[in-house]
Amino acid sequence: ITPSSPMAEHVDAWSAHGRKNLFGQPVKLVEMQSEAGAIGAVHGASEAGSLCSTFTASQGLMLMIPVLHRLSGQLKPVVLHIAARTVGTHTMSIFGDHSDVMGCRNTGFAMLCSAGVQECADLAAVAHLSTIKGHVPFMHFFDGFRTSHEIQKIHTVPEEELKKLIDEDALYEFKHKGLNPEHPVMRSTVTNPDMYFQSKEASNIWYDRLPQIVDEYMQQINTLTGRNYKLFNYYGAEDAEDILIGMGSVTGAVQETVDTLNKQGKKTGYIQVHLYRPF
């Protein structure tokens, strides 16, 4: 779905040409009848112990919401890459805002925002690494068209370096729990309120740990690249009296505005949000 389609098209091309992933395995790409089918396939594959990802935006993301609750409740290491786009209301629009991802804030997914092309490359890795170690599924989102279709030169982290960052124990645990007809189990059954509440609250331990896990991976990416990613990056005067908070492609324009205002003697700053959920 526009404007996320190019991501899936690139993966399709890589898969067709036999490009392998970090584990030296060919990537299987499946095209479904709709976004509802796509996220259902992701759910099923993750239940079998496969690491999965998909790409979507806007109305496509809205169709996925019922299964997003399932994925987060079952603590599946899944990443959605979202080129954030307006959700159609009185009319349709293919252009960017955050109305689609904002509609998913209560799904239990962690939400990581990139402001530019280089950040997309780096923080996509952070999302995939963090979901394996942290057990919480991720939405990695960035602005549709403004960022998703921007052409920039970037510096990528070598694959052999990324592979070293994978938590092998957490990955083994996930794969070991995959459904297997040789060892049948039953999951996601109906429970009464007493057990439902207890089991739901039990997952909070992973949400409490997640910001630290994301921060640790950001620091490791910083070490490899020389860049400076934090959960929240501050830019501007140390003694700022006026501070703007934002995320996404607005960052560059706001930073230029902060520079201009500070040169005029004002004390201003900007807080860029990367990890929006859990907040």
What are the functions of these language-model segments?
Residues I1-G103, G108, A125, F145:
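Thiamine diphosphate
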Residues L29-Q33, I271-P278:
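Short beta->alpha junction loops
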Residues T91-I94, I213-Y229, G246-V254, V273-F279:
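A general structural motif
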Residues F23, V27, F138-N233:
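Conformationally flexible catalytic loops at phosphate/diphosphate-handling active centers
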Residues I94-G144, E168-D169:
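Conserved thiamine diphosphate
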Residues L231-Y234, E238-K267, F279:
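Redox- and metal-dependent alpha/beta enzyme cores, enriched for Fe-S-associated oxidoreductases
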Residues V11-S15, H69-S72, H128-S130, H155-P158, ...:
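Short, solvent-exposed amphipathic alpha-helical segments in soluble enzyme
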Residues M64, H90, H149-I151, A253-Q255:
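Short helix/loop capping segments that flank catalytic or ligand/cofactor-binding pockets
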